[in-house]
Curated annotation (Swiss-Prot):
It is an enzyme of class 2 (transferase). This is Cytidylate kinase. Pfam families: Cytidylate_kin2 (PF13189). HAMAP family: Cytidyl_kinase_type2. One of its GO terms (biological process) is pyrimidine nucleotide metabolic process. It comes from the Archaea. It catalyses: CMP + ATP = CDP + ADP; dCMP + ATP = dCDP + ADP. Keywords: ATP-binding, Cytoplasm, Kinase, Nucleotide-binding, Transferase. It is found in: Cytoplasm. It comes from Methanosarcina acetivorans (strain ATCC 35395 / DSM 2834 / JCM 12185 / C2A).
Length: 180
């Protein structure tokens, strides 16, 4: 089974990917964590690292090339990244999930995770980061990140907690592939 999980920052993709990975005993590969680690290794904020990635396409292209290779060659995995669903284009039987949540909810989650000082500061950084990413995806791949038509499931993580969202996804997944 191959599952991709995508969504904007703070939507809950990493949490839900971990839960899906644990439940179905699938390997988890998270590009978001790779990107955060790369920013931290350089002593940069995500916004600053994103701005650097705008000027240096090799950062995104390397991450995305790696994702594409993984989804095309490896079974039994959850691939979590903003573009995971797009990277799975042409691969049969991949379940593509998009997790969404309103901007203010996502910013509150990011603020808790990143331990930032000011909500307004985090809001500005998140908006800037999303603009930066959308621009890069459009320029590099012609992808409109707001077009959710490629996804099999789109679910709002604000309406349910992570375990309820997992339960909803499990029902959908089990209906497609049968219970594990």
């Amino acid at each position: 089974m191959q599952i991709t999980v995508s969504g904007l920052p703070g939507s809950g993709t990493t949490t839900l990917s971990r839960l899906l990975s644990d439940y179905y005993e699938l390997e988890l590969i998270s590009s978001g964590e790779i990107f955060r680690r790369m920013a931290k290794e350089r002593g940069m904020s995500l916004a600053d690292f994103g701005a650097m990635a705008e000027k240096d396409p090799s950062i995104d292209l390397d991450i995305d090339k790696n994702q594409k290779s993984i989804i095309h060659t490896q079974d039994d995995l959850v691939l979590e990244s903003r573009l995971a669903g797009h990277m799975a284009k042409g691969v049969p039987n991949v379940l593509k999930i998009w997790i969404k949540a309103p901007l203010l909810t996502r910013v509150k989650r990011i603020q808790r995770r990143e331990k930032t000082i000011s909500f307004d500061e985090e809001l500005a950084k998140t908006v800037e980061r999303e603009k930066s990413e959308a621009l890069r995806y459009k320029n590099y791949y012609g992808i409109d990140i707001t077009d959710l038509s490629i996804y099999d499931i789109v679910i709002d993580s604000e309406k349910w907690n992570q375990y309820q969202t997992l339960d909803i996804l499990r029902v959908a997944i089990d209906a497609l592939v049968g219970p594990e």
